[in-house]
Swiss-Prot record:
Protein's name according to its UniProt entry: T cell receptor alpha variable 26-1
Signal peptide from the UniProt entry: 1-19
Keywords for this protein: Adaptive immunity, Cell membrane, Disulfide bond, Glycoprotein, Immunity, Immunoglobulin domain, Membrane, Receptor, Signal, T cell receptor
Ranges for domain Ig-like: 20-109
Cellular compartments per GO CC: T cell receptor complex
Protein's organism: Homo sapiens (Human)
Main location group: membrane
SUBUNIT field: Alpha-beta TR is a heterodimer composed of an alpha and beta chain; disulfide-linked. The alpha-beta TR is associated with the transmembrane signaling CD3 coreceptor proteins to form the TR-CD3 (TcR or TCR). The assembly of alpha-beta TR heterodimers with CD3 occurs in the endoplasmic reticulum where a single alpha-beta TR heterodimer associates with one CD3D-CD3E heterodimer, one CD3G-CD3E heterodimer and one CD247 homodimer forming a stable octameric structure. CD3D-CD3E and CD3G-CD3E heterodimers preferentially associate with TR alpha and TR beta chains, respectively.
Protein function: V region of the variable domain of T cell receptor (TR) alpha chain that participates in the antigen recognition. Alpha-beta T cell receptors are antigen specific receptors which are essential to the immune response and are present on the cell surface of T lymphocytes. Recognize peptide-major histocompatibility (MH) (pMH) complexes that are displayed by antigen presenting cells (APC), a prerequisite for efficient T cell adaptive immunity against pathogens.
């Protein structure tokens, strides 16, 4: 019998300076499955990047990935940016309990 754990991924609203992004307040997924974390940034300008960070309990923020127009992938995650750049999705390909954190979507130059 396979035990399926739930991974709770907490997201925050806005950015540190401006409320240029909106995200769901929280979401969860089954362990081992992909977690798709959406972010809306409808007022993004042409030279602003989308950055994703996460903060695990009692630790400082950790950089995950960033992109301008193209989709990006690294060893931690993938970033899908829509063609009009008004929204993006961070994809954690195989979420585990270690991925439980507060995730920040930030738009900046």
């Amino acid at each position: 019998m396979r035990l399926v754990a739930r991974v709770t991924v907490f997201l925050t609203f806005g950015t540190i300076i401006d409320a240029k992004t909106t995200q769901p307040t929280s979401m969860d997924c089954a362990e081992g499955r992909a977690a798709n974390l959406p972010c809306n940034h409808s007022t993004i300008s042409g030279n602003e990047y989308v950055y994703w960070y996460r903060q695990i309990h009692s630790q400082g923020p950790q950089y995950i990935i960033h992109g301008l127009k193209n989709n990006e992938t690294n060893e931690m995650a993938s970033l899908i940016i829509t063609e009009d750049r008004k929204s993006s999705t961070l994809i954690l390909p195989h979420a585990t309990l270690r991925d439980t954190a507060v995730y920040y979507c930030i738009v900046r130059v």
